[in-house]
Design a protein with these regions (language model features):
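N-terminal loops that bind phosphate or other acidic moieties
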Residues: 1-137, 141-261
């Protein structure tokens, strides 16, 4: 008898492969002669990197990046080798560098948490030769509109005095100018496919701050301030980059990370 085990991860407990291995061991207790094959599975959230990288014959890369609180964390991403159908591809979960599970309950504050580490993951993958990206956005501790990620990739967000704005949602309202002169030149060679399961716009009553801000530690006052700051950021982005559209479905995903992409 042949048995194929493919199970999603059990959040905060077992990875897809760990859960599959446990089931395999149970099956073999009852059917010792069974040929049991374990394959990773994921739904785009936790465990997606491992599932795609291992399931498609890729490799896992570990790198130290800036975590959501500004402290170093070790994050993982996957690399798929180039073949006839795709260039060398990186698989990234933003939650590996900016996830809410990286922030203790008492420290959750989207005014200060940053996506800078996500940009560092992308930069590391570019340095490793990747030019196509599959990025899962979700499970974030952030509401910074993705500016942290963009800062790590060389975009400059400057205040009225020409100084870089602070990391986190607190820096959004201070943005007076966006400059792209220092962006990584390799970024022009890259393509991104964003994995997202929500359609929220960036701002407003169904926007990222109102819907997801409270679970990230935002008070009602913070939600109002963050929403106004994201609107300011979106309007300035539209002046700088004509294609920026804060109403596009999914731009409010992961604290506005969808808008950044």
């Amino acid at each position: 008898m042949k048995v194929v085990v493919a199970i999603d991860s059990l959040k905060g407990s077992l990875s897809s492969l760990e859960a599959g291995q446990a089931i395999k061991e149970g099956v073999q207790v009852v059917y010792p002669e069974a040929d049991v094959i374990v394959r990773p599975l994921a739904d785009g959230g936790e465990g997606t990197v491992e599932a795609l990288a291992i399931g498609m014959g890729g490799e896992l890369v570990h790198v130290s990046v800036t975590g959501p609180l500004g402290e170093p964390v070790t994050a993982e991403y996957g690399i798929l080798k180039a073949d006839g159908t795709r260039p060398k591809t990186a698989i990234i979960e933003m939650s590996a560098a900016a996830g809410i599970t990286l922030v203790p309950d008492e420290k959750r504050n989207p005014m200060h948490t940053t996506t800078f580490g996500v940009g560092e993951l992308i930069k590391d993958a570019i340095d490793n030769g990747c030019r196509h990206f599959i990025v899962g956005i979700g499970g974030s501790a952030t509401n910074d509109g993705g500016i942290g990620m963009l800062q790590a990739l060389g975009y400059d967000f400057l205040d009225k005095d020409g100084a870089p704005v602070a990391y986190g949602g607190a820096g959004l309202q201070s943005i007076a100018r966006i400059q792209a002169e220092n962006v990584l030149p390799e970024l022009k060679e890259c393509t991104f496919r964003v994995a997202c399961d929500v359609t929220n716009p960036l701002c407003g009553p169904m926007g990222s701050s109102a819907i997801y801000g409270p679970q990230k530690g935002a008070t009602p006052e913070m939600v109002k301030e963050l929403d106004e700051a994201l609107l300011h950021y979106a309007e300035l982005s539209k002046e700088t980059f004509d294609h920026a559209d804060r109403l596009y479905p999914g731009t409010g995903a992961a604290g506005g990370m969808g808008f950044a992409f």
